[in-house]
Amino acid sequence: MTPALREATAKGISFSSLPSTMESDKMLYMESPRTVDEKLKGDTFSQMLGFPTPEPTLNTNFVNLKHFGSPQSSKHYQTVFLMRSNSTLNKHNENYKQKKLGEPSCNKLKNILYNGSNIQLSKICLSHSEEFIKKEPLSDTTSQCMKDVQIILDSNITKDTNVDKVQLQNCKWYQENALLDKVTDAEIKKGLLHCTQKKIVPGHSNVPVSSSAAEKEEEVHARLLHCVSKQKILLSQARRTQKHLQMLLAKHVVKHYGQQMKLSMKHQLPKMKTFHEPTTILGNSLPKCTEIKPEVNTLTAENKLWDDAKNGFARCTAAEIQRFAFSATGLLSHVEEGLDSDATDSSSDDDLDEYTLRKNVAVNCSTEWKWLVDRARVGSRWTWLQAQISDLECKIQQLTDIHRQIRASKGIVVLEECQLPKDILKKQMQFADQAASLNILGNPQVPQECQDPVPEQDFEMSPSSPTLLLRNIEKQSAQLTEIINSLIAPLNLSPTSSPLSSKSCSHKCLANGIYRSASENLDELSSSSSWLLNQKHSKKKRKDRTRLKSSSLTFMSTSARTRPLQSFHKRKLYRLSPTFYWTPQTLPSKETAFLNTTQMPCLQSASTWSSYEHNSESYLLREHVSELDSSFHSVLSLPSDVPLHFHFETLLKKTEIKGNLAENKFVDEYIISPSPVHSTLNQWRNGYSPICKPQIRSESSAQLLQGRKKRHLSETALGERTKLEESDFQHTESGSHSNFTAVSNVNVLSRIQNSSRNTARRRLRSESSYDIDNIVIPMSLVAPAKLEKLQYKEILTPSWRMVVLQPLDEYNLGKEEIEDLSDEVFSLRHKKYEEREQARWSLWEQSKWHRRNSRAYSKNVEGQDLLLKEYPNNFSSSQQCAAASPPGLPSENQDLCAYGLPSLNQSQETKSLWWERRAFPLKGEDMAALLCQDEKKDQVERSSTAFHGEIFGTSVPENGHHPKKQSDGMEEYKTFGLGLTNVKKNR
């Protein structure tokens, strides 16, 4: 067992990550893994991994490992962690230099053994080579050659010195001391020979050299090469040993912390049980000091460890566990960096030696935690789906069983025999009578009473027999009775009277929701079928003897729809238990209740208490979202599936706004800050302490709030409330100073406005009858509407009446009226309409001529002016008469008009020529009559009078005649005025 587990917990320490002599305040009580790593990066070996500081008298070189693994007391024992060999070996180098200052040139050989990390081994040189060097003083040439060898080795080593330094800073220890592997024997020998040729030959060319001296130099060179190769081998062995030691120590650390966590988990299990069972208290009478001995078996050791851990973990707190976790994280990361190359940076730049910070992220915010939560959500939803599928399969199986039972319990529908025609029935009755008579003749012992009805049957079978009619009526009534009885359930099969239904309902109810079992159904079916058979036999016995079965009936086949129903077994009504009624929305089970703990992101808070408050509303929130959005399922959908606009709506509807600013509520035109107790409680829930700052509400928010108030209060209530607030505000400002801060004003206003708002609301509720929340409809207004008789019940239905249809007259059918299509009849029929058309066209031609002839128009205007100057009175009177005068005037008026104005005469002549060219269905006589207006003066006057009555809507005198002409001059003026008036109207 490791020495770290042997210490006695005399003081009841919770976690024993390292021996008791360690500096616990430096390692276990650090706040973060970064602090542990910074302590681990110290230059001295005493601060590495939180181990105890060695005594100053001890030699700390790594070759002297007498203290490693030796059994010592729990307070003073040495453990060497060679995670960083440079600091340890540098200290050994300094101590060794102080001890070996008097040694001559052996230090030069030892200086050759420096690597990129300044690692120096002590006493690795062979004893005989060291003695030889001490006995035989080296010559200048040899010493110079050794210096050159050192320079060569140093030049080969220092090529990657910077790389090694950066790698050591980044904790890549696997590359330390790796440069000497590249220096082969051939390279060393080549360098020595080159040094000898360079230094000896040019420098001592003029000096005679003896053969003995040359041999000594060669021997020294050979021994030097041998020593260098030996030291290289030893260095490689030392590196392998160091790597192996690091792996062993890493396993030791991992095993140690694994045991600590295992004991912690064992301790937490009974602690959780005691939390649910407060009666069982962990006993404190256990011994506080236990020691695990190596010679005891493993089971006993584990039991003792468990007993010791129970006493130690009994007083554990969350802070101690957190400190233990931090220290373990730091040590394990340090070990990982030393052994795993992937955990370190591969860059050799000196500027990139920054330490990668490991943030102290909360457990519920880490990526691994989120992945586990998502995995649990998907797994729980999959489990819920599997449960629903299995439930549906169970229900389908139950319904299948019910359907099978219903089909098995169905009775047979028995139909009566087909009704035969009367003639066939008479023949069958005759055959039956003959057979009966034969039977009577064959059996003379039959009593005479049986022979009496035979002659009576012949009389009764006659069509006029009343007995046959009565029998038919009885047959029909019997058939109707059978049909009614078959439709009504028998009395002994009703659930109230049957012996099967007298049993308790608990015996009939099964787990699948069926009230009647299969065996009971079969028994009941057999009993009911036997009852039906008995009834059938009794009914057959009561049937009339005249209905006899014969073989001829089997050959008759009729449709089942035409045959009456004889017997019918009423179907049973099966009811399922209420738990099996299908609902459109299945409620989740208790096992899936943990799904509702996750809220929408907009509703999540920073602390556990706030999230616990929202847990009760989670299910209602999911149900609400599923009702609004059909694509969202209350159980299967994830919280991330909630649409974005629902999040925004939730944020807008929230009364509390969480953020860096204080939570403020708006009342009317002022900001009301929450009370100190409420704000501190919200700060504790949200996990932060916001700084209160004065806020000013914008005009838009004021309008929005005012609009919301108008929805709940009437205009009168709003006016009273505004007046009350203004008076309170004036009262507050009168008693306050001008140098008050914004926050103090807000606090003062908040208290006043709260009280005033409550009182105003109570007063308005008591006084105002238009409060939307307290509208009461009296029953006197509702009761008459309920008792009122509906109108559609009084609608009268129209009745039918008899209509006498009279035939058409026969004399009118044969006669047909023949229309006369001769020209004379046609002209007489259309003469009046043609005259009206002529008058219309004359007026149209006159107005058309005035529009086209601008000269005539200008002359007419000039003439009008002259007439107005000469005859103002006459012209005015002519204008008054123009409305009543006909538009189509005779040729006399045209001649009178031409007397003063020849242009008008020309226009009239042109007009007459146009009328001659028109193609009317008129004869030559009619055309001559139209040109001669003197002969048909009366017809023209009548037509013009009728035309005026239709077009201009003028009133005609009662006598039906126009006013008489007074003079020819006046007629001329009237005609001229009529033409000017028409021209003005057309303009």
From Swiss-Prot:
One of its GO terms (molecular function) is histone acetyltransferase binding. The modification N6-acetyllysine is found at residue 859. One of its GO terms (cellular component) is NSL complex. Pfam families: PEHE. The modification Phosphoserine is found at residue 462. InterPro entries: NSL1, PEHE_dom. Residues 794-915 form the PEHE domain. This is KAT8 regulatory NSL complex subunit 1-like protein.
